[in-house]
């Protein structure tokens, strides 16, 4: 072929390519949507993907029978006889938890590690003749089992004579430095909101109050964590990375924005309703963590062995936390021997089996999916992205389309009663209102009308047989981005007694209570 012939062939190919892009716009390079409002950091995204992790309240209170120690307890009282951190972590891992947070120091000031800054620690207890380091054993167990490790260090210290004075802040930060440099990677640092009140305080036996907003100089303390554990998220009533959900009963708001006006909040100084629902116009990405105990109290008490939450209650908590754009932090307290009791272990394994049954088969995975609008008609943002098993891809609409729908179409009428949907949160939380409908033998039927989605929303729906299921985003702050849509048929589980989640007895102080 001569030069002219080659040029004619190349021109013909070019014209075909251009025509294809005109007829099939999906081959165009459609730009991605712009971010909408505050967006999560990488550490926040990694944290929320854990979904379920455990709290381990184990400290002096385990042996005194209290929930909040006064600070003057004798270290000799701390004497676990068969402590086994590997037992804790193996059991939690088997039950599907991805990490655990240990109370390294609670309000009484007793330290589970041999801190160089106080004598009120395991080094003066009978445990291993004063040579023990439970934080070390915990860290080693997490590392061996591939579990994430988190640490709780109470800001309030009822043992210290200098609590309430400026010099205590340096003491607190020194202990924080010990924990964040000596035990490996930490995924979460937990700052409690309980601050100030009566206590031993070096023998003063008095009540002390502090300014919750200014005393701790929180920005300076947060900087210590950022420098020593840059991958860790920090929890408190006001973040800076993760917020308290505003209660310890086990539920996030049905409307739950991962946004908050952070400057208006501080540990121990918070609007609980705002914490529960988040704030659509929030200035920072601050997702919620639901902390709740498997027992009425946070610490082990033998009298509560018959009061461990039931599987239906634990499922309620799961749906009201992970299922409402939050994480689930379930407290599982070791007993006086230093092991998690058999009744708690059994209940957690039953819970794990129940969860597996709830989500055993994704019915949408093999179905066809269509959308009322696709961004730039591009396959990159097509409806099939919500069922491709990859949450890094997503269905998106054109910028000016904020009301749009996805329709899942089955080959045969299919029975389902659960819907799981996720937004693509790296570009922000957008959906304000959505609706779920099913095409049954009697026509289209509305199953749910809800508000926010966020990282994940899971709906318990009535059991229906449908040929099609439609998710309609009715209102959004910007063009909706949906990364995942799944449907399941869960078995019948007896409803939990006494409502969604049983409340803590009035006599048990809240771990985040404001005195």
List each model region and its residues.
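Bacterial Sec-dependent signal peptides at the C-terminal "C-region" and cleavage site
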Residues: 18-33
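Serine/threonine-rich, low-complexity intrinsically disordered segments
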Residues: 5-6, 18, 502
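Bacterial N-terminal signal peptides that target proteins for export
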Residues: 2-14
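Extended extracellular/luminal ectodomain segments enriched in beta-structured repeat modules
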Residues: 403, 411-418, 466
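Trp- and acidic/polar-enriched beta-sheet ligand-binding modules for extracellular glycan
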Residues: 398-404, 425-494
């Amino acid at each position: 072929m001569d030069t002219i012939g080659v040029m004619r062939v190349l021109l013909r190919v070019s014209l075909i390519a251009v025509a294809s892009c005109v007829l099939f716009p999906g081959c165009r390079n459609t730009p991605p949507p712009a971010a909408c409002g505050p967006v999560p950091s990488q550490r926040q995204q990694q944290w929320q993907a854990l979904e379920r992790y455990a709290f381990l309240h184990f400290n002096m209170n385990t042996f005194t029978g209290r929930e909040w120690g006064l600070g003057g307890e004798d270290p000799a009282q701390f004497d676990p006889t068969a402590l086994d951190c590997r037992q804790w972590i193996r059991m939690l891992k088997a039950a599907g938890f991805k990490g655990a947070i240990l109370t390294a120091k609670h309000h009484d000031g007793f330290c589970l590690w041999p801190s160089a800054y106080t004598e009120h620690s395991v080094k003066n207890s009978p445990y291993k003749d004063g040579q023990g380091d439970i934080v070390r054993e915990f860290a080693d167990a997490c590392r061996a089992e591939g579990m994430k490790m988190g640490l709780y260090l109470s800001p309030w210290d009822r043992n210290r004579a200098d609590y309430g004075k400026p010099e205590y802040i340096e003491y607190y930060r020194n202990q924080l430095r010990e924990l964040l440099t000596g035990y490996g990677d930490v995924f979460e640092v937990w700052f409690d909101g309980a601050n100030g009140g009566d206590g031993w305080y070096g023998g003063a036996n008095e009540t002390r109050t502090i300014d919750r907003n200014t005393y701790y100089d929180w920005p300076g303390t947060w900087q210590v964590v950022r420098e020593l554990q840059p991958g860790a998220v920090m929890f408190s009533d006001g973040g800076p990375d993760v917020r308290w959900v505003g209660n310890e009963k086990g539920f996030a708001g049905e409307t739950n924005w991962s946004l908050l006006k952070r400057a208006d909040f501080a540990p121990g100084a918070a609007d609980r309703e705002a914490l529960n629902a988040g704030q659509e116009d929030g200035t920072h990405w601050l997702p919620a963590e639901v902390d709740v105990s498997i027992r009425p109290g946070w610490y082990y008490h033998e009298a509560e062995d018959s009061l461990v939450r039931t599987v239906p209650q634990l499922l309620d908590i799961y749906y009201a936390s992970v299922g409402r754009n939050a994480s689930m932090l379930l407290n599982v307290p070791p007993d006086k021997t230093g092991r998690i009791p058999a009744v708690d272990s059994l209940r957690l394994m039953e819970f794990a089996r129940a969860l597996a049954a709830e989500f055993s088969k994704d019915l949408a995975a093999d179905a066809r999916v269509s959308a009322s609008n696709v961004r730039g008609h591009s396959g990159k943002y097509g409806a099939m992205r919500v069922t491709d098993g990859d949450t890094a891809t997503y269905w998106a609409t054109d910028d000016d389309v904020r009301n749009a729908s996805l329709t899942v179409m089955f080959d045969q009428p299919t029975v389902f009663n659960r819907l799981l949907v996720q937004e693509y949160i790296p570009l922000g939380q957008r959906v304000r209102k959505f609706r779920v409908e099913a095409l049954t033998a009697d026509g289209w039927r509305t199953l749910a009308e809800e508000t926010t989605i966020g990282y994940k929303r899971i709906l318990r729906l009535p059991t229906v047989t449908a040929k099609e299921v439609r998710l309609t985003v009715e209102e959004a702050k910007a063009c909706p981005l949906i990364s995942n849509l799944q449907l399941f048929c869960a078995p019948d589980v007896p409803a939990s007694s006494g409502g969604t989640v049983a409340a803590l007895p009035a006599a048990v102080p809240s771990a985040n209570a404001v005195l």
